[in-house]
Amino acid sequence: MIPRKRYGSKNTDQGVYLGLSKTQVLSPATAINSSSDIAPLPTPVALVPSPPDTMSCRDRTQEFLSACKSLQSRQNGIQTNKPALHATRQCSEFTLMARRIGKDLSNTFAKLEKLTILAKRKSLFDDKAVEIEELTYIIKQDINSLNKQIAQLQDFVRAKGSQSGRHLQTHSNTIVVSLQSKLASMSNDFKSVLEVRTENLKQQRNRREQFSRAPVSALPLAPNNLGGGPIVLGGESRASRDVAIDMMDPRTSQQLQLIDEQDSYIQSRADTMQNIESTIVELGSIFQQLAHMVKEQEETIQRIDENVLGAQLDVEAAHSEILKYFQSVTSNRWLMVKIFLILIVFFIIFVVFLA
């Protein structure tokens, strides 16, 4: 059998592949010897094994820890901001309540001005009694409602006083006292208007009684109405007496009608005066409630006044101490001499050693 001669790394003989197998690996020495003897042939791309897919790893533990810390700090910040948000919400509720009370006070003041204009009229023929009574009733109801609202506002401030700061509580108490003073001033004005109305009613009644006519009992009746007639004609006399009552003198009937009108007018005026008196009594009770509320605020105001006085004394003491220190510094001549000597020494050192 004739041996076959190898001419290279691969040879074909009768369709047989004699080159390297896909799994065969050459050693470095063999590869060098073979490369020195035989020119290397380009390796087919399809035969080169693809490198294995490797995933690059990176330690991101610190990033995870920093993200956890940032999230925890955000949650802590939200928790710390919750009291501030709660205080802001309480402040907004208090502001809305105070604004509503102030608006109601302004509306009631406008009604009171209108009532004042109507109550100061002294004419008998331009007396709008119905409108005055309606305004009086409305203003009285408004004052009662405002008194209740201010009491609720004070209770709200008292309930939330422990949760809010000292300055916020002081501000709230100041607003409550201001609203109470405005309500007291308006109630006092309303009371004075009612007193003016009462005086005008008394003057109108006196004027009306002065210019009214005499009552019917003082006027003589017609003799026909009181005359008797014969005893025999008793029935006819009674009939004529009945007819005489029906057929009165026109002047007497007008006087009776005028008396009825006067009675109704006097009764209406008496009712009006009773309403005014009851309103004044209710205003007195409102004044007592306001006085009690102001008395409760008196301790807070006194405490604020004492704190202001203490702060003023501290400021004055600090100012006096600063003046003393300034005088001691300005009068200390040795300090100026020492500073001058130090500057001279530094100048000499700089000129002699550094120049």
From Swiss-Prot:
Cytoplasmic topological intervals: 1-333
Function statement: Mediates endoplasmic reticulum to Golgi transport. Together with p115/USO1 and GM130/GOLGA2, involved in vesicle tethering and fusion at the cis-Golgi membrane to maintain the stacked and inter-connected structure of the Golgi apparatus.
Coiled-coil residue spans: 287-318
Topology relative to the membrane: Single-pass type IV membrane protein
Tissue specificity: Expressed in the brain, heart, spleen, lung, liver, kidney and testis.
Residue ranges of every copy of the t-SNARE coiled-coil homology domain listed in the record: 263-325
Subcellular location: Endoplasmic reticulum-Golgi intermediate compartment membrane; Golgi apparatus membrane
Vesicular compartment residues: 355
Name of a matching Pfam family: Syntaxin-5_N
Organism per entry: Rattus norvegicus (Rat)
Motif IxM motif in this chain: 245-247
Residues annotated as transmembrane: 334-354
Molecular-function annotations in GO: SNAP receptor activity; SNARE binding
Cellular component, GO, one term: Golgi apparatus
GO aspect biological process, one term: vesicle fusion with Golgi apparatus
Oligomer status and interactors: Part of a ternary complex containing STX5A, NSFL1C and VCP. Part of a unique SNARE complex composed of the Golgi SNAREs GOSR1, GOSR2 and YKT6. This complex also includes VTI1A. Component of a SNARE complex consisting of STX5, YKT6, GOSR1 and BET1L. Interacts with BET1L. Interacts with BET1. Interacts with COG4. Interacts with GM130/GOLGA2. Interacts (via IxM motif) with SEC24C and SEC24D; mediates STX5 packaging into COPII-coated vesicles. Interacts with VLDLR; this interaction mediates VLDLR translocation from the endoplasmic reticulum to the plasma membrane.
Similarity comment: family membership: Belongs to the syntaxin family.
InterPro entries: SNARE (IPR010989), Syntaxin (IPR045242), Syntaxin-5_N (IPR021538), Syntaxin/epimorphin_CS (IPR006012), T_SNARE_dom (IPR000727)
Keywords: Coiled coil, Golgi apparatus, Membrane, Transmembrane, Transmembrane helix, Transport
Protein name according to UniProt: Syntaxin-5
Keyword Transmembrane: yes
